[in-house]
């Protein structure tokens, strides 16, 4: 087969336009290129963590965001700090818009600390400070 006139053919003369062509051999030979690979047992174990397993940094970030939205009921602005808390949990600092204003430099921002245990459950939260968005702030 010639490469001329067929922009989908590669140098081996194989037509790449048909993305449903079978790839590989063995048990995965039936999987097509446009299908995602099957999850392995280790992938499923990570995505289905038991409630007693410890969480990592990225899970702590997700849980802190969810907790801020649920517990504090203000518009979520962002997570500005996450750190391990004595090896048995996480300390996170989030910012929430407590009052919108015009101009937005006059918005009131609340900075809250949310603590999580090693499994990601919220163990407490505290308002650290409030400030206007336009005020110069020293970062944590």
Curated annotation (Swiss-Prot):
Subcellular location, principal: other
Biased composition range(s): Polar residues: 39-56
Induction statement: Expressed from a single promoter upstream of gvpA; most transcripts stop at the gvpA terminator, with low read-through into downstream gvpC-gvpN-gvpO. Expression starts in early stationary phase and is maximal in stationary phase. Highly expressed in 25% salt, poorly expressed in 15% salt, no gas vesicles are formed at 15% salt.
This protein's record includes keyword Iron-sulfur: no
Compositional bias ranges of the Basic and acidic residues kind: 1-14
Region span, Disordered: 1-61
GO cellular component terms, A-Z: cytoplasm; gas vesicle
Location in or out of the cell: Gas vesicle; Cytoplasm
Effect of inactivating the gene: No longer makes gas vesicles in H.volcanii; cells translate GvpA but do not make gas vesicles.
GO terms classed as biological process: gas vesicle organization
Pfam family, one: GvpO
Keywords: Cytoplasm, Gas vesicle
Oligomer status and interactors: Forms homodimers, forms a GvpN-GvpO heterodimer, interacts with GvpC, GvpF, GvpI and GvpL, might interact with GvpA.
Task of the protein: A minor component of the gas vesicle (GV), may play a role in transcription and/or RNA stability and/or in GV assembly. Gas vesicles are small, hollow, gas filled protein structures found in some microorganisms. They allow positioning of halobacteria at the optimal depth for growth in the poorly aerated shallow brine pools of their habitat. Expression of a 9.5 kb mc-vac DNA fragment containing 2 divergently transcribed regions (gvpD-gvpE-gvpF-gvpG-gvpH-gvpI-gvpJ-gvpK-gvpL-gvpM and gvpA-gvpC-gvpN-gvpO) allows H.volcanii to produce gas vesicles.
Family per similarity comment: Belongs to the gas vesicle GvpO family.
Note: Encoded in a 14-gene locus called mc-vac.
Full protein name: Gas vesicle protein O
């Amino acid at each position: 087969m010639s490469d001329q006139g067929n922009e989908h053919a590669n140098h081996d003369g194989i037509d790449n336009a048909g993305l449903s062509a079978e790839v590989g051999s063995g048990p995965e030979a039936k999987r097509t290129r446009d299908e995602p690979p099957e999850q392995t047992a280790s992938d499923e174990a990570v995505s289905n963590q038991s409630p007693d397993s410890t969480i990592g940094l990225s899970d702590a970030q997700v849980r802190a965001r969810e907790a801020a939205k649920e517990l504090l009921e203000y518009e979520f602005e962002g997570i500005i700090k996450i750190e391990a808390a004595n090896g048995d949990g996480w300390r996170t600092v989030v910012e929430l818009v407590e009052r919108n204003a015009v101009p937005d430099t006059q918005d009131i921002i609340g900075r809250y600390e949310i603590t999580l245990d090693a499994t990601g459950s919220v163990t407490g939260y505290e308002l650290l400070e409030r400030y206007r968005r336009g005020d110069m702030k020293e970062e944590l």
